[in-house]
Amino acid sequence: MNIPFKKGNILLPKDTDMTKWSVVACDQYTSEPDYWNDVAKIVGDSPSTLNLTLPEIYLEDNNVEERINNINSNMSKLIQENFFVEYPDSMIYLERTQSDGKVREGLMGIVDLEAYSYEQGSQTPIRATEKTVIERIPPRVKIR
């Protein structure tokens, strides 16, 4: 059986404040601009995935193309500046403590996108856990 979750070359930032580097998924807080404004204030000029993602709250803004261009530019800049440490052929074990004290465990690796489908009722090995909003896919493709 071909398992579509594997080891891969994983990039992690070096010498970075990880509390500012990581942000929640871009499809969260879609109706709470204050949340994203607060995150931007916390991050400030520090390196952050906030500058590498397009929170869905901004998908309808007039400057979405400018945001996408900035994201792509930020990605290129970080690669050119040798900002990351590469862990070749790896998986990374993660632990996260929730506000209630419960520890969540995870494993970071790579997935074969040929084994993924967002279509309802799909039987592919990797499926969406919630309904996908098709209109939100094109901006994501421009970023990747």
Question: Residue ranges of each PLM-predicted region?
Answer:
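A cross-family signal for N-terminal binding/gating loops and helix N-caps
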Residues: 1-143
